[in-house]
C-alpha cells in the first residue's frame, strides 16, 4: 500500500522531487529488508 502511494506521488511531482522521494523510498526499503533479516535470525535462533 505504502509503495503504491509513493510511486503515485513521484509521477505527479517534478523530476527533482521525484528523485528525492525515490531516494527516501530506497532508504525505507533497506530498513524493511533489515527488519525482515532480523526476524529471520530470531526465528533461526
UniProtKB/Swiss-Prot annotation:
Picking any one GO biological process from the record gives: translation
Subcellular location per the Swiss-Prot or TrEMBL entry: Plastid, Chloroplast
Composition-biased stretches, type Basic residues, lie in: 10-19
Report the GO molecular function annotations: structural constituent of ribosome
Kindly report the protein's main subcellular placement as a broad class: plastid
InterPro entries in the record? Ribosomal_bL34
Q: Where is this region: Disordered?
A: 1-21
Q: Which Pfam families match?
A: Ribosomal_L34 (PF00468)
Top-level taxon: Eukaryota
List, alphabetically, the GO terms of the cellular component aspect: chloroplast; ribonucleoprotein complex; ribosome
Protein keywords: Chloroplast, Plastid, Ribonucleoprotein, Ribosomal protein
Family membership noted in the UniProt record: Belongs to the bacterial ribosomal protein bL34 family.
This protein is called Large ribosomal subunit protein bL34c
**Gene source species:** Cyanidium caldarium (Red alga)
Q: What is the lineage of its organism?
A: Eukaryota, Rhodophyta, Bangiophyceae, Cyanidiales, Cyanidiaceae
This protein's encoding gene: rpl34
Amino acid at each position: 500500500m505504502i509503495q503504491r502511494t509513493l510511486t503515485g506521488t513521484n509521477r505527479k511531482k517534478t523530476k527533482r522531487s521525484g528523485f528525492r522521494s525515490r531516494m527516501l523510498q530506497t532508504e525505507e526499503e533497506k530498513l524493511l529488508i533489515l527488519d525482515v533479516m532480523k526476524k529471520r535470525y530470531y526465528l533461526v535462533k
